[in-house]
Amino acid sequence: MSVIFRATARRQKPLYRRKNNISIMKRQTRTTTLVCLCLAMLSSSISAQTKQPLRIGVAGLTHTHVHWIFSSVKNGDIEITGIAEPNRELAERYADQYNYPKNRIYKTLEELIAAENPEAVAAFNSIYEHLEVVEICAPKGIHVMVEKPLAVSLKHARKMQQLANQHGIFLLTNYETTWYPTVHQARKLMQDSSAIGPIRKIVVHDGHQGPKEIGVNKEFLDWLTDPIQNGAGALTDFGCYGADLSTWLMNGQKPVSVMAITQQIKPDIYPKVDDEATIVLTYPESQTIIQASWNWPFSRKDLEIYCRSGLITAKDRNNLSYRFQEKNKETAVTLPERKPPFQDPFSFFKAVVRKEITLEDNDLSALPLNVTVMEILDAAKRSAKSGKRIKL
């Protein structure tokens, strides 16, 4: 019996050890519950932040693309927290048109930021002023989106890049064509259809009859036709589209050289800047021709991609055609709008800032790609002035 008793005794734990184990288990349960609760609260907080509109300040109203941001408010992704515009009459004109509260109009960007504390700023002033916007916003951690192109010069662009990287902000460039379903489908067809071979030539047509001819307002026309404020004429205004698309389609590759010819076909209307520009980008195995003009018979933004044995044409925002192999007939399609947030610049801006999507270096809006765009435009201006091909 003593043997049986000893065996049983070994199996039983002392009472104080059992109580201690129970206490430990309770503490572990409470800790686990607390951790789960904290994670749930954090997740809820992140989700709530994601659902809140991005608070954007507007820097300047002299670029008429500013109508775009007012129209985008209805999507629910952004809130315009304030407007910085020194021209009070112009600011009140927009406020009246869009029923915007006039007590949120400020004379300077610094005043707007101090009063409204925006998360981000969208610049709709002259291209020359883009640098100043970044100089004000970057040290404060405020993200920035500018209208195309990134900067008035390569020097400005590199300074803006340095500030954005130093202070960890997003700096995006908005192009109308970035939101075209056709350009994205063209790239997808090119990538998916290996049978058509590599790119041999890209031809980009952008422009309209001329800014004065289409009736842009005086505030826009004044700086758009100023070589200091705009950097050039049609070369800057519409050459940037082709440089952006070409760099994107070439997966970030820079051209070997740039050659440009500019003209003043209407010097009586545009005496200070070019109104016609042709830019040729030479790559090791392909070529891009950018035709930027204020002399087209109608507005156009279209793109042709010639591959070894196929042609893809983005005719406008929604209409695309393609022909693969000489024996095949052309196929034409009409594309629906892209899904949110890829259909609108400000929905996209919000998604980038809130880190709902990842902005890649070769994205059409991304800073590295747009610095390359500025290298191309800088070389194009130097080429047009010298009559020589510029190597990059």
Report each predicted region and the residues it spans:
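Predominantly a Rossmann-like dinucleotide-binding segment in NAD(P)-dependent oxidoreductases
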Residues: 180-261, 265-269, 387
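Rossmann-fold dehydrogenase core element
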Residues: 159-177, 200
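Contiguous beta-strand/loop segments that form the cofactor/metal-binding neighborhood of enzyme cores
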Residues: 242-319, 347-356, 379
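Hydrophobic residues in well-ordered beta-strands that form the structural core
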Residues: 58, 146, 171-173, 314
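Beta-loop-alpha module in the N-terminal Rossmann-like domain of NAD(P)-dependent dehydrogenases
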Residues: 98-163
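C-terminal helix-rich "cap/oligomerization" subdomain common to oxidoreductases
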Residues: 120-122, 348-392
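N-terminal Rossmann-like dinucleotide-binding module
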Residues: 38, 42, 46-98
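Bacterial N-terminal signal peptides that target proteins for export
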Residues: 19-34
